[in-house]
Curated annotation (Swiss-Prot):
Cofactor note (record): Binds 1 zinc ion per subunit.
E.C. number(s) listed in UniProt: 6.1.1.3
Family matches, as Gene3D superfamilies: 3.30.54.20, Anticodon-binding domain, Bira Bifunctional Protein, Domain 2, Threonyl-trna Synthetase, Chain A, domain 2
Substrates-to-products reaction catalysed: tRNA(Thr) + L-threonine + ATP = L-threonyl-tRNA(Thr) + AMP + diphosphate + H(+)
Origin species: Thermoplasma volcanium (strain ATCC 51530 / DSM 4299 / JCM 9571 / NBRC 15438 / GSS1)
Protein name: Threonine--tRNA ligase
GO MF terms held by the record: aminoacyl-tRNA deacylase activity; ATP binding; metal ion binding; threonine-tRNA ligase activity; tRNA binding
GO biological process, one term: threonyl-tRNA aminoacylation
InterPro entries hit by this protein: aa-tRNA-synt_IIb, aa-tRNA-synth_II, aa-tRNA-synth_II/BPL/LPL, Anticodon-bd, Anticodon-bd_dom_sf, TGS, Thr-tRNA-ligase_IIa, Thr/Ala-tRNA-synth_IIc_edit
Gene name per UniProt: thrS
Length: 660
């Protein structure tokens, strides 16, 4: 028996078998159970501790119920809808009148009162008819019951509050000691967009220390919000009247964008990628053939020209790259063919979902598509993962990365493009998706999905990561409908995980477009496409960079690399000479030779976050030197040529830290 398992006898309550107040539930196989449940047989279960990942989820789930309990105590007319656990916390939606920050404080105090009472939380099972009676005054719960309950289901009760829920929960409200309500928002009811619900966000942790650390990080995150930094550094314009959701880059912002593109061009070039360009608009026939029309139509910008032809602004770059690849025939020796493009795509998002650079309606991807043989998958995936590691290490420095492998859910083949084999006539059909597949030869519906292509590609992705010593998690059912994929996340300076890179295998777009090559035996064989984006998108990547570095970007990315200040007007000419030397050396430099004091000039330029402030006075002019101040406030005097070499070296190496 594993060391973390506990033996429980038939008829024994889990709580009695464990008798450890740090344990809040048990896990039996893949199922979580309340401590008050009784073992149906002699069995081994795993204890779920409050401070574990699973324990934190259960704690926050219980905190959401605690929130609903407090709200309905204070606002009896409020109708609870749903209250899920989300990243870093939870929320609950209510049909009620809008509330204020003052109300939020009162709700939190009521939650604390219920916690202090240490109310037991009990699980009870009812039939569907009984559930409909219990929640007869709440149309939101009635809908959930009618859509999800067939025979019986569970509710959880704490004092006078009862909620529909599968559980599990902490044993009593006294376990929810460290929590905080964070904000109020408006949420649209998914079944009726005219109905606005009140959404209350909160978080909970196993202890006050963890909660305090999280709240401190939240405050720091507000200071690092990329939208705030963008305004301070004058990087982009967001105009809700003329271009809602379409960011426009200022000269400063375009510098960062161009440097990122330049670096990706370098990484692409040394790994065999060639640059292409594709238009922003295509006839809708290409989107229908690619499958994007069916999947993305609600998010596409579509229009009809006077001649009657229908067009769509591209939501993806891949069909354009496919059109370029399809211009000629290929031998097996020609593959892989790798196309890359900083391609801008356009996707409609509801106005309430658009925000800053992380959720725009137009964004530029460092998009790449390679056309390969099936036997090349492992090698090419390893190359791509190497590009990911090199890129993130260069840009962020020593940063934690996490890798996810999204695979097919074989229990639901209808969600994926698959090959099917007719059990009656043996005919094989490629690239079908749906629930009622018909054989085009004998018209039988007795069709078996063939997972072999998916299995082969998925195993090659595993092999690639295993051979590189990469630890990864697998997520069944998270694959795209046309193939398995790898997602790469990074952890920023505040400990937040951000999904950036995607490496996606695609077997079925080659079927849609008839993409083949001639193999070594002279026969036509289908190519495989790998879609990849290392940054993800330049917009999102820039937002994460700004927040990670709090706007103090590495010098090679910083719009103003040096800011030259004369001590007085007598040294203004020397300051201009120093600035020209920097500009001539390719350094992005600005001189402020105005009449303000040095301290005032430094204060004025603070929000622009230059890499170095160069101060020159009479002594520097006499000695042909410069006094350089770094971002930490440390100053050092260099000869002019010496400083030029130092900063040029820092930029050329794309160093994350400063030279001193």
């Amino acid at each position: 028996m594993p060391i973390n398992e506990i033996r429980v006898q038939k008829g024994q309550r889990y709580r009695d078998a464990i008798n450890d107040k740090k344990v809040i539930a048990v896990k039996k196989g893949d199922k979580f159970l309340d401590l008050d449940e009784i073992a149906g047989e002699d069995e081994a279960v795993q204890p779920v501790y409050l401070d574990s990942e699973d324990g934190l989820y259960i704690l926050r789930h219980s905190a959401a119920h605690l929130l609903a309990n407090a709200v309905t105590n204070l606002f009896p007319e409020a109708l609870p809808n749903t209250g899920p656990v989300v990243e870093n916390g939870f929320y609950y939606d209510f049909d009620m009148k809008p509330i204020t920050e003052e109300d939020l404080s009162k709700i939190e105090e009521e939650m604390k009162r219920i916690v202090k009472e240490n109310v037991p939380i009990r699980r009870m099972i009812y039939s569907k008819d009984e559930l409909l009676k219990i929640f007869s005054k709440n149309p939101y719960k009635i809908r959930i019951i009618n859509e999800n309950v067939e025979g019986k289901s569970s509710v959880y009760q704490q004092g006078n509050f009862v909620d529909l829920c599968l559980g599990p929960h902490v044993p009593s409200t006294g376990y929810i000691k460290a929590f905080k309500l964070l904000s109020i928002a408006s949420a649209v009811y998914k079944y009726d967009e005219s109905k606005n619900l009140v959404r209350i966000y909160g978080t909970a942790f196993p202890d006050e220390k963890s909660l305090r650390r999280y709240l401190e990080n939240l405050e720091e995150a507000k200071k690092r919000d990329h939208r705030k930094i963008i305004a301070e550094m004058d990087l982009a314009v967001f105009n809700s009247e003329w271009a809602p959701g379409f960011p426009m880059y200022t000269p400063n912002g375009q510098i960062i964008r161009k440097e990122l593109i330049k670096y990706m061009d370098y990484v692409n070039g040394k790994n065999g990628w060639t640059d292409v360009w594709t238009p922003h608009v295509f006839k809708d026939t290409i989107w229908k053939q690619s499958g994007h029309y069916a999947k993305y139509k609600p998010n596409m910008y579509l229009f009809v020209l006077p001649d009657g032809d229908s067009y769509g602004i591209k939501p993806m770059n891949c069909p354009g790259h496919i059109a370029i690849f399809a211009r000629r025939k290929y031998s097996y020796r020609d593959l892989p063919v790798k196309y890359s493009e900083p391609g801008t795509v356009y996707r409609y998002e509801k106005s309430g979902e658009v925000g800053g650079l992380t959720r725009p309606r137009a964004f530029t991807q460092d998009d790449g598509h390679e056309f390969i043989r099936m036997d090349q998958i492992v090698g090419e995936i390893k190359t791509l993962l190497g590009m990911v590691r090199e890129t993130f290490t260069t840009v962020f420095g020593n940063i934690e990365m996490a890798f996810d492998l999204s695979v097919i859910d074989k229990e639901h083949p209808e969600n994926y493009l698959l090959s099917y084999v007719c059990k009656d006539c043996g005919n094989r059909v490629e690239g079908l998706r749906g629930t009622d597949i018909e054989c085009p030869v004998c018209h039988s519906h007795n069709m078996d999905p063939d997972f072999s292509t998916w299995d082969n590609a998925t195993e090659q992705l595993r092999q690639a990561m295993d051979s590189m010593g990469i630890t990864y998690k697998e997520y069944p059912g998270e694959a795209a409908f046309y193939g398995p994929k790898i997602d790469v996340h990074v952890k920023d300076a505040l400990g937040r995980m951000w999904q950036l890179s995607t490496i996606q295998v695609d077997f079925f777009m080659p079927i849609n477009f008839g993409l083949t090559y001639t193999n070594s035996e002279g026969k036509e064989e289908r190519v495989v496409i790998i879609h990849r984006a290392i940054y993800g998108s330049y917009e999102r990547f820039m937002a994460i960079l700004l927040e990670h570095f709090a706007g103090k970007l590495p010098t090679w990315l910083t719009p103003i690399q040096t800011y030259v200040i004369p001590v007085g007007t007598a040294n203004a000419e020397y300051a201009r000479k120093v600035n020209k030397s920097l500009l001539d050396a390719g350094i992005r430099s600005v001189v402020d030779d105005g009449p303000d004091t040095v301290s005032k000039k430094i204060k004025m330029i603070h929000d622009q976050r230059p890499s170095y402030i160069v101060v020159v006075g009479a002594k520097e002019e006499q000695d042909n030197t410069v006094t350089v101040r770094n971002r930490a406030g440390k100053s050092k005097t260099y000869g002019m040529n010496e400083f030029l070499e130092i900063i040029k070296n820092e930029i050329e190496k794309r160093s994350v830290g400063q030279a001193f």
